[in-house]
């Protein structure tokens, strides 16, 4: 792996690994090696959820559990993590197998999001909880400053359903049109058909649920509700 690219990534992250092998593992997809990043991803997912929950708890002392849960879900969901990954140009640093490289895996939202979680797990093992917590808060500063409780934090499928019901329109239909990849690393493509839109809207994700949420989010944007 190009050391110039790796050093540039660490500068963008705001953290230099003491044990570079942890960084290498965090950037390695299971298609590239048996020493891949899925265990780090598991760890990072839990750490991220805790750090964001703790930040929201202290930022919003009068907000109830439901609104805090929805805000946390917005901040830790796959497309938010993928946005962060793109801000760090993470795609150019990924270690992917030939099949994933050929299919453009370095652009795939689910792979970018999973790698961000693996990096969080790697930083924790390389340092301590205080260091990784401060790093996450630095990454999320703008998003934490901008987020607020309310209906906008409901997931896209719920918001779309409520919008249509409020106008006495039929509920959206979701159809799986493609499933790519091996069982452990699939990508679902969903078509969402909504009354008033001439063509179905496409969403993709690492599970059917995530793909449906992505499609609903695109519908909301077309309806100018996002």
From Swiss-Prot:
Superkingdom classification of source: Bacteria
DRBM domain: residues covered: 155-225
Occurrences of domain RNase III (ranges): 6-128
UniProt key word Plastid: no
Reported cofactor(s): Mg(2+)
GO biological process, one term: mRNA processing
GO CC aspect terms: cytoplasm
Predominant location category: cytoplasm
Keywords for this protein: Cytoplasm, Endonuclease, Hydrolase, Magnesium, Metal-binding, mRNA processing, Nuclease, RNA-binding, rRNA processing, rRNA-binding, tRNA processing
Active site annotation, chain numbering: 45, 117
Main enzyme class: hydrolase
Residues annotated to bind Mg(2+): 41, 114, 117
One Pfam assignment: Ribonucleas_3_3
PANTHER family on file: RIBONUCLEASE 3, RIBONUCLEASE III
Protein name, UniProt field: Ribonuclease 3
Protein's organism: Salmonella choleraesuis (strain SC-B67)
Lineage, opening ranks: Bacteria, Pseudomonadati, Pseudomonadota, Gammaproteobacteria, Enterobacterales
Gene that this polypeptide is encoded by: rnc
């Amino acid at each position: 792996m190009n050391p110039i690219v790796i050093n540039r990534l660490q500068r963008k992250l705001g953290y230099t690994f003491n044990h570079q092998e942890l960084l290498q593992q965090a950037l390695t997809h299971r298609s590239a090696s048996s020493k891949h990043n899925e265990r780090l991803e598991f760890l990072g997912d839990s750490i991220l959820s805790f750090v964001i929950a703790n930040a929201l708890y202290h930022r919003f002392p009068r907000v109830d559990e439901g609104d805090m849960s929805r805000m946390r879900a917005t901040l830790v969901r796959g497309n938010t993590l993928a946005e962060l990954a793109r801000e760090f140009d993470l795609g150019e640093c990924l270690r992917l197998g030939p099949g994933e490289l050929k299919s453009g895996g370095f652009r795939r939202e689910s792979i970018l999001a999973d790698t961000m979680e693996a990096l969080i797990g790697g930083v924790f093992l390389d340092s301590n909880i205080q260091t990784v917590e401060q790093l996450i808060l630095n990454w999320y500063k703008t998003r934490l400053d901008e987020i607020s409780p309310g209906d906008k934090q409901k997931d896209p499928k719920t918001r779309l359903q409520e919008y249509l019901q409020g106008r006495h329109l039929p509920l959206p239909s979701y159809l799986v049109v493609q499933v790519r990849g091996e069982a452990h690393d699939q990508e679902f493509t969903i078509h969402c058909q909504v009354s008033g839109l001439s063509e179905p809207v496409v969403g993709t994700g690492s599970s059917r649920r995530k793909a449906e949420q992505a499609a609903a989010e695109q519908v909301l944007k077309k309806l100018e509700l996002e």
